[in-house]
Amino acid sequence: PQQVVLPGFHTAAENGLKKGGNGNEIFLTLCGLMSSGSQTILLSRWRTGGQTAYDLTREFTQELPHRPASAAWQRSVQLMMHAPLDPEQEPRVGDQDTELGATADHPFFWAGYLLVDTGDAADAGEEK
């Protein structure tokens, strides 16, 4: 597939302060996917789960046919930063997480994603 979205990808970054990997799990995954022909890859470095992750990736994939991957991602993050947050729909958010507000503007929800794109689709559109 030309576009791959892996919102549940597990990496060592998920363990936070525990001693983790050196990033090879991400690098080798990206190399394998790109060598198989993928042009756009979105993967998570830690799992957030929940409704916000679903909405974020849904918005990204809906916008991807209409704009470059970076613009589609920026738009989806902006929408989620202003979207209402329902803690009951977020399995990794507990009652003790008081610094989270009423919206999903905390970086926990969107900063853990890594977008890799060849830019080929955007270049082809500009040449026409």
Placement of each model-derived feature along the sequence:
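Catalytic cores of nucleophile-dependent amide-cleaving enzymes
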Residues: 1-59, 65
